[in-house]
Amino acid sequence: MYLRKPIQKIKSEVQIRLIRYYTASENAKVTYHEEMQNNFIATNIFQKALLTCGSAVIALLDPHRGDMIACLGEVTGENAIKYMHSKMLQTEEGQDILKNKPRINSKTIAFETLSQMPENSLGRVYADFMKDNNITADSRLPVQFIADPELAYVMQRYREVHDLVHASLFMKTNMLGEVTVKWVEGIQTKLPMCIGGGIWGAARLRPKHRQMYLKYYLPWAIRTGNNAKFLQGIYFEKRWEQDIDDFHKEMNIVRLLKK
């Protein structure tokens, strides 16, 4: 069983049940397959090639163009997404994710409740990260160019847990933190977009950050990507109450930075 020991407080138990009920009831309103069908845009090989070239150029010129980065990830990531899907099928936890297809947004996650959980819980770490960095869980674009609903969900899941990976690794949202997380994700998911982001993003680092990156962050990211459990197959929503130190130990993550 992948669930870990809950925090032994009645208040926390009530909070956890509310979070899970809220998540389940919202997810029941519309299936992911229905949403995917509404968002899907069919493309041929020529159109995919144009999208690949265009999105890559624009993303390089302006790393803040999330729409172009998302597009690039979809049109270049087919083999990597199939790999991610196969990795998720290898564990009970990953299978549960693929079966339930949970979503992470402001309608499915009670962030106010998470923010009241014990300080060292995964849920609190995530809520504090989102608040401190002024991030909304609704900022992740829907998948548009992947025809297979199962693979489309895997890509959607990758996007929606990205901030959770940031938070659980204690990585900031600045360029240094983003590049570091991209390397961890790239090693684990094999997504060309992540690997490219790690390479090209590093070229944009300022001298001081570049020195820190080469000496500390890059070696740590490579070790973490190779040694940690497959983070895309972790059912974070069922672990809100888990102590972050216990989470790191279970995931085989050696912390680079303190919270």
Curated annotation (Swiss-Prot):
Keywords on record: Lyase, Membrane, Metal-binding, Mitochondrion, Mitochondrion inner membrane, Ubiquinone biosynthesis, Zinc
Lineage: Eukaryota, Metazoa, Ecdysozoa, Arthropoda, Hexapoda
InterPro entries: Coq4, Coq4_euk
Family the UniProt entry places it in: Belongs to the COQ4 family.
Entry keyword Lyase: yes
Binding, Zn(2+): 162-163, 166, 178
EC number: 4.1.1.130
Enzyme class: lyase
This protein's pathway: Cofactor biosynthesis; ubiquinone biosynthesis
Organism: Bombyx mori (Silk moth)
Misc. remarks from the entry: This protein may be expected to contain an N-terminal transit peptide but none has been predicted.
Reported cofactor(s): Zn(2+)
GO terms, biological process: ubiquinone biosynthetic process
Quaternary structure and partners: Component of a multi-subunit COQ enzyme complex.
Reported function: Lyase that catalyzes the C1-decarboxylation of 4-hydroxy-3-methoxy-5-(all-trans-polyprenyl)benzoic acid into 2-methoxy-6-(all-trans-polyprenyl)phenol during ubiquinone biosynthesis.
Catalyzed chemical reaction(s): a 4-hydroxy-3-methoxy-5-(all-trans-polyprenyl)benzoate + H(+) = a 2-methoxy-6-(all-trans-polyprenyl)phenol + CO2
Membrane-related topology note: Peripheral membrane protein
Cell location: Mitochondrion inner membrane
GO cellular component: extrinsic component of mitochondrial inner membrane
Protein name per its UniProtKB record: Ubiquinone biosynthesis protein COQ4 homolog, mitochondrial
